[in-house]
């Protein structure tokens, strides 16, 4: 990542308390971006809730000389997605990019999967990406620039045993990405 691309840009990274999201937040900050580190602090199975993971990443960024703030709102709710975008605006005065990385799993054989398990995964992966993108879209339009990054998976293209919910959400993200890029 070249520094000029993101220098002084404000980027929200969802699901940034660990894994790929954490690495993206750290890389963006190292390249000069101001980062909103969003994570509700649950496991991939959705258990627990803790502000610690997001705050820890913020502390790592600040220790390296970067700028970041933590946010623990859930992408699975439209109003909360609006608060995440507002956090960027309140903290840094603008928003230039959204990395939709938040995700959970509820793996189960399709014939045993409950409606709650189906909904939970779609609400975070697909609806969460929609809510975040929609919350940022008007700001991007007004400033005539902005970037969405949606994390998909080959599971969305070829399916994966025990992951009908995840696969459906990820293929939906491909279509969402193509449609809003027009």
What are these regions (language model features)?
Residues 61, 109-110, 117-119:
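Substrate-binding pocket helix/loop in short-chain dehydrogenase/reductase
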Residues 111, 158-165:
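Active-site loop immediately N-terminal to the catalytic Tyr-X3-Lys motif
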Residues 133, 169, 177:
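Active-site helix of classical SDR
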Residues 153:
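Residue(s) in the substrate-gating loop at a strand-loop-helix junction
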